[in-house]
Amino acid sequence: MIIYLHGFDSTSPGNHEKVLQLQFIDEDVRLISYSTLHPRHDMQHLLKQVDKMIQHSDDDRPLICGVGLGGFWAERVGFLCDIRQVIVNPNLFPQENMGGKIDRPEEYVDIATKCVANFREKNRDRCMVMLSRHDEMLDSQRSAQMLGAYYEIVWDDIQTHKFKSISPHLQRIKAFKTLG
């Protein structure tokens, strides 16, 4: 089972395309939709939904995958639910770049600081990060500096922020998923 979390643009056709691509790894790909506007509510909703999916799945090696803002959530929710994560161009600082788009961007700071202390150290090697060298929305070098000490960084030289095609990376994602 692969759980997919969309980014801020939840209606983008790219989400459906990525779900179809992920089905080459595992036929059971489940998209969880969330508001993107209310961080605290989103956190509770995502934790509840992911936990329910894990409990009702017979896959002993589930994976959570998130793109952009979904990457912010996938890293944290995956850690808290003890499943591996793949985060694609994760929005690590939504409080800085989501102002005017969401109601309370400051809640992201609260969530980030209230997650388990040193959670990335405790999550070491359980998350794979895919970054685009041509991300027009986020500073991928900043993300690499923040995450590189804990997780494998996979660089892509073609994709932009929305990372329309993950196909070239499917074998790597599949291998990462099988590690459980």
UniProtKB/Swiss-Prot annotation:
Gene3D superfamilies membership: alpha/beta hydrolase (3.40.50.1820)
Residue stretches in coiled coil: none
A Pfam family this chain is assigned to: UPF0227
InterPro entries: AB_hydrolase_fold (IPR029058), UPF0227 (IPR022987), UPF0227/Esterase_YqiA (IPR008886)
Family that this chain belongs to: Belongs to the UPF0227 family.
NCBIfam families in alphabetical order: PRK04940.1
Protein name per UniProt: UPF0227 protein PC1_2487
Biological source species: Pectobacterium carotovorum subsp. carotovorum (strain PC1)
